[in-house]
């Protein structure tokens, strides 16, 4: 299926998703939205690996995607636990407010 999609289109899509995720991390102040934006960035890099692997007919792109997927799952679990602790302690998920509380 990926053989019929031009490589450039897949890489453009991956770049667009990565940029959207980066904008989300930089613009949003809610920690959960920042985490979701980071997940979008990780999925964009995985898509780039899959497209590049499909271009040359190699399995390394899919292997790297599985590694990225595993890393994203572990990162999400740890980050959600930390976000829950921050919310219980400070009562907010706004990154600006948290940095002001720190002093």
From Swiss-Prot:
First-listed, main subcellular location of the protein, grouped into a coarse class: membrane
Membrane topology note: Multi-pass membrane protein
Family matches, as InterPro entries: NADH_UbQ_OxRdtase_chain4L/K, NUOK/Mnh_C1-like
One Pfam family here: Oxidored_q2
GO biological process: ATP synthesis coupled electron transport
Keyword set, alphabetical order: Cell inner membrane, Cell membrane, Membrane, NAD, Quinone, Translocase, Transmembrane, Transmembrane helix, Transport, Ubiquinone
GO molecular function: NADH:ubiquinone reductase (non-electrogenic) activity; quinone binding
E.C. numbers: 7.1.1.-
Catalysed reactions, as listed in the record: a quinone + NADH + 5 H(+)(in) = a quinol + NAD(+) + 4 H(+)(out)
Domain of life assignment: Bacteria
Keyword flag Transmembrane: yes
Residue ranges crossing the lipid bilayer per the database entry: 7-27, 31-51, 65-85
Record's keyword annotation contains Membrane: yes
Top-level EC class as recorded in UniProt: translocase
Compartment list: Cell inner membrane
Gene3D superfamilies in the record: 1.10.287.3510
GO CC annotations, alphabetized: NADH dehydrogenase complex; plasma membrane
NCBIfam families per record: PRK05715.1-1, PRK05715.1-2
Subunit composition and interactions: NDH-1 is composed of 14 different subunits. Subunits NuoA, H, J, K, L, M, N constitute the membrane sector of the complex.
Protein's job: NDH-1 shuttles electrons from NADH, via FMN and iron-sulfur (Fe-S) centers, to quinones in the respiratory chain. The immediate electron acceptor for the enzyme in this species is believed to be ubiquinone. Couples the redox reaction to proton translocation (for every two electrons transferred, four hydrogen ions are translocated across the cytoplasmic membrane), and thus conserves the redox energy in a proton gradient.
Family classification: Belongs to the complex I subunit 4L family.
Protein name as annotated: NADH-quinone oxidoreductase subunit K
């Amino acid at each position: 299926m990926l053989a019929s999609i031009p490589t450039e289109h897949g890489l453009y899509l991956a770049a667009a998703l990565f940029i959207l995720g980066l904008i989300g991390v930089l613009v949003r102040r809610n920690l959960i939205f920042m985490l979701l934006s980071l997940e979008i960035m990780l999925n964009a890099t995985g898509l780039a690996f899959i497209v590049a692997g499909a271009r040359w007919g190699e399995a390394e792109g899919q292997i790297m995607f599985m590694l990225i997927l595993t890393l994203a799952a572990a990162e999400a679990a740890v980050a959600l636990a930390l976000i829950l602790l921050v919310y219980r302690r400070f009562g907010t998920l706004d990154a600006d407010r948290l940095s002001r509380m720190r002093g």
